[in-house]
From Swiss-Prot:
One of its GO terms (molecular function) is nicotinate phosphoribosyltransferase activity. This is Nicotinate phosphoribosyltransferase. PANTHER family: NICOTINATE PHOSPHORIBOSYLTRANSFERASE (PTHR11098:SF1). The modification Phosphohistidine is found at residue 220. Pathway: Cofactor biosynthesis; NAD(+) biosynthesis; nicotinate D-ribonucleotide from nicotinate: step 1/1.
Length: 400
């Protein structure tokens, strides 16, 4: 038995909203699709020593289930359908889908199974890993230190924004997956609720309990899976965009742009998509360059950028968000999703740079070729070459 035997997670809804949004779409359209996903630590942390503790938490997750009050709350949201929610009511995590190993100090995790089930593991599992590691490394740290750090940042934020009209500044908590702990995330979000510019959280459990707006649409895996679901690789991104609109024709209309670079995305994002989607989300590459490309694209299509929203969510902190707001606020609607720099920003605490990404769909490779070379993930170099050729991308930077 490990030092921390009690479960880290207490609710099936302690996850990012887009996981349920994507899960419903998969449930309706791709029920029998199978996938594989893998854990990556982008830093130099040797996390293999935590494998036993992580495995123990994975086993505990099989006891999580949707509670009646949670079911009723989800039923009151406008985008969930009864057939999906009734299925979710019976959903249980299956620990047999998760292989956790310590490979000479390196933590390896591989997830396999039906996409409709595997899709749920990523966010809570990353949150578990982050919390376990920080419990071991920084047992003396917690809510008090996190709130002290936040108050200091808010003082700086007030000074930075003293000359700005902040009425169109919108901030969201995107901090579940790399949080210091569940308690820290809740405390941070509760404090931010006092600010007029704080508009919601990606965490469905917190949104329900704190009466906040849940935030999120789709992730890279939605686009990655379509690389094998779609019969034609070159049209797979358009297929993913169309399938999303099929499930959510009038809601959840922020599209993620960097699964196969922003330039390739914009070539696929024609007038119909640009009109029907409410906006775009940035998650890699230079944010100012990306925003300028997005605005120019809307203008080229004859669409007023002020009718659309750009969501920035890549490695943001409050200062970066203010800088972007200062640059773009007169030309387009803006929202900012901050994760690690809110929920794991404590002095002397090193946040983990960890991800879980799709690597296979129906037994075949998928890839993410983002606007940041270090974020490229794929085992199969031949598939990466085929993907780059299909989307007319320049010569590959080294995949990792």
């Amino acid at each position: 038995m490990t030092q921390f035997a009690s479960p880290v997670l207490h609710s099936l809804l302690d996850t990012d909203a887009y996981k349920l949004h994507m899960q419903q779409a998969v449930f309706h359209h791709y029920y029998d699709v199978h996938v594989a996903a893998e854990f990556r630590c982008r830093g130099d942390d040797l996390l293999g020593i935590y494998a036993d503790a992580i495995r123990e938490q994975v086993n505990a997750m099989q006891h999580l289930q949707l509670q009646e009050d949670e079911f009723q709350w989800l039923s009151g949201l406008p985008f969930f359908k009864a057939d999906y929610l009734n299925w979710l009511r019976d959903f249980r995590y299956n620990p047999e889908q998760v292989c956790v190993t310590n490979d000479n100090g390196k933590l390896n995790i591989r997830l396999t199974g039906p996409w409709r089930e595997v899709i749920m593991w990523e966010v809570p599992l990353l949150a578990v890993i982050s919390e376990l590691v920080h419990r071991y490394r920084s047992p003396e740290m917690g809510v008090a230190q996190a709130l002290d750090a936040l108050e200091s940042k808010l003082v700086d934020f007030s000074a930075l924004t003293a000359d700005l009209n902040m009425s169109r500044f919108h901030l969201m908590d995107f901090g579940t997956r790399r949080r210091f702990s569940r308690e820290v995330q809740q405390a941070i979000v509760k404090r931010l609720q006092q600010e007029p510019w704080f508009v919601g959280t990606s965490n469905y459990d917190l949104a329900r309990r704190l009466s906040l707006t849940p935030m999120g649409t789709q992730a890279h895996e939605w686009f990655q899976a379509h690389q094998q679901i779609s019969p034609d690789l070159a049209t797979s991104q358009r297929a993913a965009l169309a399938a999303w609109l099929n499930e959510y024709p009038n809601q959840l209309g922020i599209a993620l742009t960097d699964c196969i670079t922003m330039d390739a995305f914009l070539r696929d994002f024609g007038t119909e998509f640009a009109t029907r989607y409410q906006g775009l989300r940035h998650d890699s590459g230079d944010p100012v360059e990306w925003g300028e490309k997005a605005i120019a694209h809307y203008q080229k299509l004859g669409i007023d950028p002020l009718s659309k929203t750009l969501v920035f969510s890549d490695n943001l902190d409050l200062k970066k968000a203010v800088d972007l707001y200062r640059h773009f606020s007169s030309r387009v609607q803006l929202s900012f999703g901050i994760g690690t720099r809110l929920t794991c920003d404590i002095p002397q605490v090193k946040p983990l740079n960890i991800v879980i990404k799709l690597v296979e769909c129906n037994g075949k490779p998928v890839a993410k070729l983002s606007d940041s070379p270090g974020k490229t993930i794929c085992h199969d170099k031949a598939f990466v070459r085929a993907l780059r050729k299909a989307f007319d991308l320049p010569h590959i930077k080294k995949a990792s």
